[in-house]
Amino acid sequence: MKVLMFGWEFPPKIYGGLAVASYGITKGLSLQNDVETTFCLPKPTGEEESFLNIIGMNQVPVVWRDVNYDYLKSRLPNYMTPEQYYAFRDHIYADFSYLNVNDLGCMEFAGGYPANLHDEINNFSIIAGVVARQQQFDIIHAHDWLTYPAGVHAKMVSGKPLCIHVHATDFDRSRGKVNPTVYATEKNGMDYADCIMCVSELTRQTVIREYHQDPRKCFAMHNAVYPLSQELLDIPRPEHKKEKVVTFLGRITMQKGPEYFVEAAALVLKRTRNIRFIMA
């Protein structure tokens, strides 16, 4: 099975949990003998691991440019060959000459989450139309709302099933103060999706209730964890003879629930004083 996957970040460039989750699922799929994954990123670093195929959307042309082979070879990064560039160029499907493109006819991406994020999401989906016309694949997988438009476009072009991966909803990120533009993007992706993967049952229920999705196409798939390496296991554990230590490991954001940690600490410390709470 060939998977065409759209994601917004991937190690070694990590902005948050999305990169780690994207790595985990693609690494797991790579261990299956019958699965081949092509991962589309706005702006790869060129240092991504080689267990999957990387497509840099910033190297896929959307405007025809008559570029010779030697010049291409000098301009393209290590994850794109001139042959691949020409193959994509042959699948430009509309006149995008009004867009801001470079000398190769490609759109540039800032990477990460710039001020013009919604413009970059739209550009990403335009390029997805070229990729979906050129690539051979059996299923589409889109990570989070940023790539839902790309996934929907790829489905409309290819007719292949779309699976979207809901790492979080805007209800989770905003404590209920939902951005209507983000909500519309999320809901449109869910409406077009053939299946909706949610990171928890709580997220699944939010998708069903707030986005009015059919429960039959929504399922929870929890993020996995890797066992610790022997090198880490061999590190001597510190002895806390007088204190017990409770650690909060996570970003200090509403979504991770740090206030619950503080509230729990206050309750515990009313009963005992030999516990140290650490936010790391």
Where are these regions (language model features)?
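A short beta-strand/loop micro-motif in the catalytic core of glycosyltransferases
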Residues: I140-H141, Y192-E201
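Nucleotide-sugar donor-binding and catalytic loop/hinge architecture
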Residues: M1, E231-V245, L269-R271
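Carbohydrate-associated surface elements
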Residues: L202, A224
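Active-site proximal beta-strand in glycosyltransferases
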Residues: V3, I139-H141, Y148, V152-D172
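Membrane-proximal helix-turn-helix segments that form the acceptor-binding/catalytic region
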Residues: G129-Q134, M156, N179-I196
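Conserved donor-binding/catalytic core segment of Leloir-type glycosyltransferases
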Residues: E239-K256, V262-A265, I278
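A conserved catalytic-core segment of Leloir-type glycosyltransferases
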Residues: D34-Q135
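Nucleotide-sugar donor phosphate/pyrophosphate-binding loop at the beta->alpha transition
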Residues: L117-I127, K160-C163, F171-N188, P227
